[in-house]
Amino acid sequence: MAENQNNLIWIDLEMTGLDPERDRIIEIATLVTDANLNILAEGPVLAVHQSAEQLGLMDEWNVRTHTGSGLVERVKASPFNDRDAELQTIEFLKQWVPAGVSPICGNSVGQDRRFLFRYMPELEAYFHYRYVDVSTLKELARRWKPEILAGFKKQNTHQALDDIRESVAELAYYREHFIQS
């Protein structure tokens, strides 16, 4: 393992909803790639404990999705609060990327960053202010080269580590079929 300023930090959060003023983080996962999108390491995948009251605020989609994946039970049983998950994640990242150099990478990471800012501010500050948002390329491909969209199928497991791996693979797909074409 070697700290490298060109490595990229990828993150995905699962939340109880989309509003950081009301909803909470229930799972966090990170991984690190090199600049060529080769996965170097996967960080801890942590269910973040939330109260039954907080979980009761989830809408039907979140209840169905996170119950079906087993995440709700993992959240109820988890010994980790927001701060525990934040610190474990930062300790992992320090081994691979210095603070303040990697953009936050993933799909729709602007949403994740809003939750990090509210509930895990030290982790949010670990990232550079820039973004590598795969969903931007997807939206551009939808408008400029829609025929390539059928070539990449997501599994949509809504499990944080699976989602990050898919984001890395999706960016590699767009690099080959959209950016370099």
From Swiss-Prot:
Hydrolase as UniProt keyword: yes
Gene Ontology terms for molecular function: 3'-5'-RNA exonuclease activity; nucleic acid binding
Primary localization class, coarse: cytoplasm
Principal EC category: hydrolase
GO CC list: cytoplasm
Function: 3'-to-5' exoribonuclease specific for small oligoribonucleotides.
NCBIfam families: PRK05359.1 (NF003765)
Protein name as catalogued: Oligoribonuclease
Organism per entry: Yersinia pestis
Species classification: Bacteria, Pseudomonadati, Pseudomonadota, Gammaproteobacteria, Enterobacterales
